């Protein structure tokens, strides 16, 4: 370990593993360490099931009705991949897709007046949907046509809207959309967690709705994908990429100290040895004095023996409960997957309800979601602090990732990755940087 590296990475969460992969592909010498004996950090999948019970201090362990412990891979952080989103792009560019198998999530649902409705995925579904009345549908269709044709580089498509100054509230007004449709559009399509976006320039919202539609167009059922064997497969896929390009991995490796000289990182000390480096990437748990708390998320993992009611017996789905429907500031989400994804025993389902904490009784906040899941065989409640770095790391060369937020997709995580890359490399992130180099010394032969 007593060696000189360009970059040392602490923690094998998804953000850290993707950055480690990119740095290795770009010719950097990388050492990647984790104090845990497993990959994934906060974003790991726990197996066998006995391990999950232990982690949540349920000492009696799983009953026999849960089947074989080894058949379970339970995500600690519930997220899906947008089919046309940035993480899929990263997987394709790096060819990490060859280590993973994905399934399309069967449906996306939205909560309205105590019931759940399928988010329409085709024009026919939209016309048949009970989510809105006849005239509302016509106006909504006009709005969707506007979004589909919108091109930020072609003012002819703006229809009198200025993407940089017109607020989204004004765009909704222009198409005369009612409150329910606005809730549905902002939260189930643009996937905002709160209503803060309404008074911001509309460009980002329009682009988010386009991303949803384009992702949906790829597979038809929903815009989301999920990897077989759980999300823990993602960091491992990128760790393989890093290793192929010469990255060194050490799990179960305690970090005793991060060594600084004149305010700059110069190395990491572990078990009496020092590895030197020019730059350091880590998750917040490794540098508690360089991060601040930015809120909390509650996630309740529920094991069920039945599909969720009114989802047409889907073996995977997402449910969004827009905040307006339950008098909150932030949406509540449910991600459900099952034995069909090799993450649970035969006939079992895993539904994870999550939201940003707003009160001193977080469990009560998630109740509307839990009511949709009854009866629940077993619950595991996790309340996590969200951390963000206190500075950009440019001076110390210590670059810290943000905690995983309450969103049900990876777009915010990818933004964090691109942002850290830019601060480390001094140049904007470009997907081309992730391409495997042809015929290089570490390149794998085609399968």
From Swiss-Prot:
PANTHER family (alphabetical): RAB GDP DISSOCIATION INHIBITOR ALPHA, RAB GDP-DISSOCIATION INHIBITOR
Superkingdom in the source lineage: Eukaryota
Leader sequence segment: none
GO cellular component entries: axon; cytoplasm; cytosol; endoplasmic reticulum; Golgi apparatus; midbody; myelin sheath; neuronal cell body
Functional summary from the UniProt entry: Regulates the GDP/GTP exchange reaction of most Rab proteins by inhibiting the dissociation of GDP from them, and the subsequent binding of GTP to them. Promotes the dissociation of GDP-bound Rab proteins from the membrane and inhibits their activation. Promotes the dissociation of RAB1A, RAB3A, RAB5A and RAB10 from membranes.
Disease with which this protein is associated in UniProt: Intellectual developmental disorder, X-linked 41: A disorder characterized by significantly below average general intellectual functioning associated with impairments in adaptive behavior and manifested during the developmental period. Intellectual deficiency is the only primary symptom of non-syndromic X-linked forms, while syndromic forms present with associated physical, neurological and/or psychiatric manifestations.
Similarity section: Belongs to the Rab GDI family.
Pfam families registered for this protein in UniProt: GDI
MF GO annotations: GDP-dissociation inhibitor activity; GTPase activator activity; Rab GDP-dissociation inhibitor activity; small GTPase binding
Main location per the UniProt record: cytoplasm
Tissue note: Brain; predominant in neural and sensory tissues.
Name of the protein described by the UniProt record: Rab GDP dissociation inhibitor alpha
Effect of residue 92 to P: In XLID41; causes reduced binding and recycling of RAB3A
KW Cytoplasm (keyword) present: yes
Assembly and oligomerization: Interacts with RHOH. Interacts with the non-phosphorylated forms of RAB1A, RAB3A, RAB5A, RAB5B, RAB5C, RAB8A, RAB8B, RAB10, RAB12, RAB35, and RAB43.
Gene behind this protein: GDI1
Cellular localisation: Cytoplasm; Golgi apparatus, trans-Golgi network
